[in-house]
């Protein structure tokens, strides 16, 4: 079963083992005896594949161990070797049953099978009443029996016992030795390390070692051969194995988080703030953008203004005129929903003893709908008003507020105001326009454009033509077509256009840029939180080094250890993300309750993005600590206090 030839182990210039050669047959009960520093524990660690010899040959069950990789050695420990340690090496967060079941988890056995086997083993060792007890609730003898049960969980063809009675009282020590003798009688191969000759005398073969060399090798009787040993087959990673690994990792991660509540919460704080920031920033951006777009919609969506000149501020624009012929040409275009004229002039509005600087806006019937103006009382202009150049006016909110400060809108209908000495009957009052990007204090009277031309300015030319494009038509294509048609009609391009969609796109682009910049701040907060997670995971690896060594000793592969700490990092980040989302929902609710300017809009995609990014942060910042844990040397890890 075990064949060692010329095994040497050097640490620096110190020779721990010197050309050790021995063979152990299956079913033997061997005691390796020697004083402290003799090399007996180093020899046991090499036999148990926890350590690697500096030179020599080691064959276990027809496999040359010195040529196996780390995962193959882990499989050998998992399937054929059981360890019994002097200090028990039970995981403090797990119950007795869970500790015993652990090797079967890494072997890919199902939960029910693991549970039944663990109960049977503990029952055989008279611990049926301690299944759910944690190690700190057990006596030393009971803990050692749990350790023995764990060693037998996957069969334990070879039991390696390192000073198994060293930390026990004499009664418990005798019980442990009796258990080992019974196991040997059943066919298990036992290799026991001790410094006590009385304990060594219980074995059927005693090997004495001193200063790294074998002094004597005494056999008492032939070895038992009751076990039918299996040769190692190629390991397959089944779905059950992966499920068991993941479940165990989640359980350990959850227990670890609960065991250090305050530390875990402080670690999550960075993630919570980062995720809440991401969700709130997106909600704020969506809310403000929706408000602006709504305002633009009320100001007039898909609208195009045509004005004389080559652009805003053109000094020669006064020499250029738009006329009714241009207006009729545009009205004939089928892709335009509405077309109307617009002119204005400044003057003085008077009512009784109140006189104000004001502007008369000469508009048509469609202008109110095109510009998104909403009536508060009365009516808007109709076709008869425009056709007959009637002296009627619709006051805006500023005009009503300044000319009739203490009266309701409906009470001033029918009254007459003067504009540049011309009387105008009030037929309507507009609502306050809260959707303008920039609020102004201009007093406006909306009158028929024909009235403005015929009775106020005498100018038959139009200052502006405003059109509304149909919803199913691209405003950009419509604008290009209008420019081309008017250019052909007028013989030159002596006019310019302003498309409301250009303003809308500029606002949207500006909001997008602002959102991206603010999101960058939130991402930085997430990264800071991720660094906090990495820091605490490094601390966790340092604190749990011994646990890692124990898991490796019972057969955990490096990928099992790595998965465990990665899942723990991801779990911390995910819980932090969920708490961050909950916090953001409260913030959004509070903001929407207290603020009337614009709402914060919770977006499902931002929540999903937050959760996914937190998992990504967990993987990225958990990888380095997890890799450190997976690369630990089992012997160094087990010796860590």
UniProtKB/Swiss-Prot annotation:
First-listed, main subcellular location of the protein, grouped into a coarse class: membrane
Family (UniProt): Belongs to the ABC transporter superfamily. Macrolide exporter (TC 3.A.1.122) family.
Localization annotation: Cell inner membrane
Subunit record text: Homodimer.
Alphabetical list of SMART domains matching this protein: AAA (SM00382)
Domain named ABC transporter: residues: 2-236
UniProt protein name: Macrolide export ATP-binding/permease protein MacB
Superkingdom in the source lineage: Bacteria
The enzyme's E.C. designation: 7.6.2.-
Record's keyword terms, sorted: Antibiotic resistance, ATP-binding, Cell inner membrane, Cell membrane, Membrane, Nucleotide-binding, Translocase, Transmembrane, Transmembrane helix, Transport
Function field: Non-canonical ABC transporter that contains transmembrane domains (TMD), which form a pore in the inner membrane, and an ATP-binding domain (NBD), which is responsible for energy generation. Confers resistance against macrolides.
Uppermost EC category: translocase
Membrane protein topology class: Multi-pass membrane protein
A single BP term in Gene Ontology: response to antibiotic
GO molecular function terms listed in the Swiss-Prot or TrEMBL record: ATP binding; ATP hydrolysis activity; transmembrane transporter activity
Stored PANTHER family: MACROLIDE EXPORT ATP-BINDING_PERMEASE PROTEIN MACB, MEMBRANE COMPONENT OF TRANSPORTER-RELATED
Pfam families per the UniProt record, alphabetical: ABC_tran, FtsX, MacB_PCD
Residue stretches spanning the membrane: 265-285, 519-539, 571-591, 604-624
GO cellular component terms, A-Z: plasma membrane
Positions annotated to bind ATP: 34-41
């Amino acid at each position: 079963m075990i064949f060692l030839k010329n095994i040497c182990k050097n640490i620096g210039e110190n020779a721990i083992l010197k050309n050790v050669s021995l063979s152990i047959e299956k079913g033997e009960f061997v005691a390796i005896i020697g004083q402290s520093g003799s090399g007996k524990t180093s020899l046991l660690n090499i036999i148990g594949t926890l350590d690697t010899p500096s030179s020599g040959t080691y064959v276990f069950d027809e496999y040359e161990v010195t040529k196996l990789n780390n995962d193959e050695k882990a499989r050998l420990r998992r399937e054929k070797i059981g360890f019994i340690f002097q200090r028990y090496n039970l995981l403090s967060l797990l119950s007795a049953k869970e500790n015993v079941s652990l090797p079967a988890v890494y072997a890919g056995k199902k939960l029910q099978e693991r549970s039944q086997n663990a109960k049977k083993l503990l029952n055989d060792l008279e611990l049926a009443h301690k299944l759910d007890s944690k190690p700190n609730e057990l006596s030393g003898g009971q803990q050692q029996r749990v350790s023995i049960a764990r060693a037998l969980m996957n069969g334990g063809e070879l039991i390696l016992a390192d000073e198994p009675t060293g930390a026990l009282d004499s009664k418990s020590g005798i019980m442990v030795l009796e258990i080992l003798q019974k196991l040997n009688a059943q066919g298990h191969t036992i290799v026991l390390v001790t410094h006590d000759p009385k304990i060594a005398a219980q074995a059927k073969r005693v090997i004495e070692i001193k200063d790294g060399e074998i002094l004597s090798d005494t056999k008492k009787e032939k070895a038992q051969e009751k076990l039918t040993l299996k040769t190692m087959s190629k390991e397959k990673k089944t779905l059950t194995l992966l499920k068991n690994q993941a479940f165990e990792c989640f359980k350990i991660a959850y227990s670890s988080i609960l065991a250090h509540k305050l530390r875990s919460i402080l670690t999550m704080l960075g993630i919570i703030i980062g995720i809440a920031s991401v969700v709130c920033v997106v909600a704020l951006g969506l809310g403000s953008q929706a408000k602006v777009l709504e305002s633009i919609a009320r100001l007039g969506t898909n609208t195009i203004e045509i004005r004389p000149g080559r652009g805003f501020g053109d000094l020669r624009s006064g020499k250029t005129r738009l006329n009714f012929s241009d207006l009729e040409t545009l009205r004939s275009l089928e892709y335009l929903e509405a077309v109307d004229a617009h002119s204005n002039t400044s003057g003085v509005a008077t009512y009784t003893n109140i006189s104000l600087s004001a502007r008369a806006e000469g508009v048509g019937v469609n202008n109110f709908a095109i510009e998104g103006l909403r009536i508060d009382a009365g009516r808007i202009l109709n076709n008869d008003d425009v056709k007959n150049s009637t002296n009627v006016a619709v006051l805006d909110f500023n005009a009503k507020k300044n000319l009739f400060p203490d009266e309701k809108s409906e009470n001033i209908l029918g009254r007459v105001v003067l504009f540049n000495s011309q009387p105008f009957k009030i037929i309507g009052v507009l609502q306050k326009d809260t959707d303008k990007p920039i609020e102004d204090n201009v007093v406006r009277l909306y009158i028929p454009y024909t009235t403005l031309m015929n009775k106020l300015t005498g100018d038959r030319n139009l200052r502006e033509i405003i059109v509304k494009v149909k919803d199913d038509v691209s405003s950009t294509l419509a604008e290009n077509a209008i420019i081309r048609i008017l250019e052909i009609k007028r013989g030159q391009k002596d006019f310019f256009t302003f498309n409301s969609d250009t303003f809308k796109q500029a606002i949207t682009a500006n909001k997008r840029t602002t959102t991206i910049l603010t999101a960058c701040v939130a991402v930085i907060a997430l990264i800071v939180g991720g660094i906090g997670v990495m820091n605490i995971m490094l601390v966790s690896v340092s604190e749990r080094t011994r646990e890692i060594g124990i898991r490796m000793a019972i057969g955990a592969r490096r990928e099992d250890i790595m998965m465990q700490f990665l899942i723990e990092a991801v779990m911390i980040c995910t819980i932090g993300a969920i708490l961050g989302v909950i916090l953001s929902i409260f913030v959004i609710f509070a903001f929407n309750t207290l603020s009337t300017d614009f709402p914060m809009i919770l977006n499902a995609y931002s929540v999903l993005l937050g959760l996914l990014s937190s998992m990504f942060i967990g993987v990225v910042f958990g990888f380095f600590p997890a890799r450190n844990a997976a690369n630990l040397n089992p012997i160094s890890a087990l010796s860590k206090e």
